Amino acid sequence: MAVSRALALRLAYAAAGALMGFSAFFTWSLAPAFRQPATAAAGGLSGVLALWALITHVMYVQDYWRTWLKGLRFFLFIGILFSALSVVGFCTFLVLAITQHQSLTDPRSYYLSCVWSFISLKWAFLLSLYAYRYRNEFADISILSDF
């Protein structure tokens, strides 16, 4: 399958998102000045979801989804599940940051965890959206959906 310009941009965007998420995970996990487990977890989740979106696009380019539509349903479910988890995390970190009167500029504050939870929400939504679109594209092959 030929890679269109839009698909190439989606591949590059997902790859950059995975790199940014994993770099946030390692920064807030390993650097003593920035050590904040909540931000590391939210950044790591963002990186994993971006990687799943990248894998979704790569499998689309390789035409793998045509024979495994149930996998797209699974990716859609995972995207919805992590969207809900990201919203809960965003609200929780926002409430914690407000009740503890944390500074917006502090790298250890829960406000950064809110930002990374929102980015995780974005990647979970995009994972669901791409899985839904690719599933609709291959829905005409309903005979193979039992595999």
Curated annotation (Swiss-Prot):
Reactions listed under catalytic activity: heme b(in) = heme b(out)
One Gene Ontology molecular-function label: heme transmembrane transporter activity
GO terms of biological process kind: heme transport
Motif (Di-leucine motif): 143-144
Keyword Transport appears in the UniProt entry: yes
Transmembrane segments: 11-31, 41-61, 74-94, 111-131
Subcellular location: Endosome membrane; Lysosome membrane; Cytoplasmic vesicle, Phagosome membrane
Keywords: Cytoplasmic vesicle, Endosome, Lysosome, Membrane, Transmembrane, Transmembrane helix, Transport
GO cellular component: endosome membrane; lysosomal membrane; phagocytic vesicle membrane; plasma membrane
Pfam family, one: HRG
Membrane-topology descriptor: Multi-pass membrane protein
UniProt similarity note: Belongs to the HRG family.
Function, as annotated: Heme transporter that regulates intracellular heme availability through the endosomal or lysosomal compartment. In macrophages of the reticuloendothelial system, is the heme transporter for heme-iron recycling. Essential for macrophage iron homeostasis, transports heme from the phagolysosome to the cytoplasm during erythrophagocytosis (EP).
Protein name: Heme transporter HRG1
